[in-house]
């Protein structure tokens, strides 16, 4: 079992999610979302990013591993009368229930960064993204001044990371090498990658776009 599932189902993480609403809305406003856009929100929680995207007219599917957060997300979607926004349980490292190239935008905000198998998650994100689509990640970074980021940085000093995951204190060069490796897993040619860049808003995000 994914250890995150047991942990997240023990508490009420919707209380934490409420403190992140502004971040999700700020990110969505910068993504150029249009009516009918096919969006996948990974590590969606109770819809911090998914609901704002759906309110702009996108067809949104949220996937997360804890049942309680998925149920909370579907409840919020019903309360806002958003029939174009649904949530389902799923392991981000194994999205076998989703077809290849099904989404024009794949987004994960403070979600995939916690996955025990980051490389597998990256492969799945690329697999389900249409050619010409976009992958957008919002992550805390080592020098992020927010309280949660500092807690994660301190705790990572005393706990070994799962296999394949980088510590927040790891060298930038190592992180960039991992980023290149993720890109190369999509194809033997890097022409599939349009651009990879860091963009900073209220909280930082990393965006990757793929093209034919």
For the regions a language model picked out, list residue spans one by one.
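Class I SAM-dependent methyltransferase SAM/SAH-binding core
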Residues: 38-96, 120
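A short SAM/SAH-binding and catalytic strip from SAM-dependent methyltransferases
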Residues: 104-119, 141
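A short acidic, Gly/Pro-enriched loop at the edge of an enzyme's catalytic core
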Residues: 93-106
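Conserved Class I S-adenosyl-L-methionine
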Residues: 172-212
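Acceptor-substrate binding/catalytic loop of class I
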Residues: 143, 162-177
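Conserved class I S-adenosyl-L-methionine
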Residues: 1-37, 48, 72, 79-80, 134-161
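A short glycine-rich, Lys/Arg-flanked "PGG" loop and its adjoining helix->strand segment in the class I
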Residues: 119-134
